[in-house]
Amino acid sequence: VPCCILNPADSFRFPVFLLVGAPRCCTTALSRYLTRNPQICFSRPKEPHYFVRTDYIPGIDELKRDYLDRCFAHCTLSHRALGEGSVSYLYAPGVIERILHFNPKAKFIVQLRNPLKMLPSYHLRMQFLLQEDQVDFETAWALQAERKRGEHIPKRCLDPRLLYYSEVAKFGVQIERLFELAGREQTQVIIFDDFASDTLGTYQRILEFLDVDYDGQTDFERRFGSQMYRYLWLQKLLFVPATSNGKVVGTLQQRLRKYNPDGSKKSTWTQRLTRLNKVPRSPQPLSPQMADSLREALRPDIQHLSGLLGRDLSHWVDK
C-alpha cells in the first residue's frame, strides 16, 4: 500500500509494481502479457516516464494531475496490482528514490539481455524516436564523451542522457543501486534467455512475486521487432517537440497527447501517417572490432552483475 502522504482515494492508483528496464529487452511483450491478467491494471501509456521528467519529488496535486489521473484513470479497486513500464527508470539517477518516496513497498521488475545485442537495438530505437541523428552505432558510441559536455546533441533530443549508451548498458551498477534502495525482496530480475526459453514459467513466477493469481494464459506471442521510417524527412515534419518557454521538455507531454483523459487512445491524422510511414528494420550487425571494444568496456560491469545475481553471465562478453 502506498505511503500515508497519499489519501486513500489516490493511493490505490499509485503503482504497486514498476517494470523499469532494461530498454530493448522484451519489456513490451512482458507488459502485454501482464495487461491481459484481469487482476492487473497497466498504465496508459505503458511508459509514462513521469519520474524522469523532473529532478525533484512532485507535490501531491501535481502527482495526481499529471500522473495518477492521466495514466491510471482506467484502473479500479477491483484490480489487485497496478503497474507501469518506463524502462528509463532503471538507469536515470534519482528516479527509484522518488518512487519509493510515494510507495516504500513498491516492487520492481527488471528484464536484462546481452548488452551486445541490446545496444544496437537501442540505438536503432533512438533513431526511430528521432532522439538520435547518427545512423552508425560506432559513431554514436564514440560521441558519448562530447555529448556529456553538451556537444553534438540532436535538436529533437528530449534528454541527452538517452544517448549515453555505456550508462544505459551498465546493468551491474543499476542493479546494485536498485538492490540498495528497494531491497532484493522487492526486486525481481529476469534474464531474457530464461524468458525466451520458458515464458510460461517466468510469467508465473512474476505473478507470484506480485501476489496475483495465474489467469491460465498460455499464448505468449512476441510479434514486435525494430522499426524505422520509409521517409525520415516526413517523420521529422510530423514530430514537433513539446516546448515550454522555448525549451524542450520531457516526454510525458508528448505521450499524453496521444491519450484521452480516460486513458483511451486518440487517433489523429499525424498518427495515421506515422503508422503508414513505419517499416520493419533490423539493427546493423556489430563489426568484429566494435564487438571486441564493447566486450572490453562492459566486461567489468557484467562480472559485477554476475556476482550480484549469483549467476555466471560471462558468456555475454566472451568470444
Question: What does each model-found stretch correspond to?
Answer:
Residues 1-90, 101-157, 182:
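PAPS-dependent sulfotransferase catalytic core
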Residues 31-35, 52, 100, 120, ...:
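Non-transmembrane alpha-helical segments in soluble domains
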Residues 61-76, 132-219, 240, 245:
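PAPS-dependent sulfotransferase catalytic domain
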Residues 95, 119-124, 130-131, 201-203, ...:
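Short aromatic-enriched loop/helix-cap "lid" or pocket-rim segments at secondary-structure transitions
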Residues 176-292, 296, 310-319:
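The conserved 3'-phosphoadenosine-5'-phosphosulfate
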